[in-house]
């Protein structure tokens, strides 16, 4: 399972590559991840412009211009790859992925942009994608998890 620093590196890398981009098309190849992906997932993400990529604990949050969001958890073996559309060159940050050969049967979700696509690859299918329509839904979802590890509220007094 990716640890918090790895998830933060993925967030930073995605912020550099997809922030400000518009999703052109979403393709779900397998809805049976840890939680079943809803049938309107593609419709929800289609044509959304990415405002920023946040992180809460080990969750990646794609925040869109309309303040809706897509929340991603990588599970045990999930990885995110950015691949150029025409020549299949992997443009993912190479410092945290050793092998760019992606078995296609584990490419469960593709989010397509103009010149490249984001591929979610997960052999064990323990990761998941969900979406939230606004800030209130997002905050309600994460309220039960306690403070973010880098939040000033997370100190020795909170623990003890």
What are these regions (language model features)?
Residues 1-70, 74, 85-93, 110-114:
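Extended, highly charged segments
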Residues 70-160:
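Phosphate/anion-contacting hairpin/loop surfaces
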């Amino acid at each position: 399972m990716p640890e918090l620093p790895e998830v933060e590196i993925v967030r930073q890398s995605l912020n550099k590559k997809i922030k400000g981009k518009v999703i052109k098309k979403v393709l779900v190849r397998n809805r049976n991840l840890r939680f079943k992906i809803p049938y309107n997932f593609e419709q929800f993400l289609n044509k959304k412009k990415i405002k920023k990529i946040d992180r809460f604990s080990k969750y990646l949050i794609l925040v869109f211009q309309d303040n809706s969001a897509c929340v991603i958890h990588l599970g045990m073996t999930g990885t995110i790859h950015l691949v150029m559309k025409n020549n299949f060159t992997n443009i993912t940050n190479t410092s945290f992925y050793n092998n760019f050969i992606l078995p296609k049967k584990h490419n469960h979700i593709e989010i397509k942009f103009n010149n490249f696509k984001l591929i979610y690859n997960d052999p064990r299918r323990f990761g998941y994608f969900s979406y939230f329509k606004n800030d209130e839904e997002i905050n309600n979802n994460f309220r039960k998890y306690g403070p973010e590890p880098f939040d000033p509220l997370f100190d020795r007094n909170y623990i003890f």
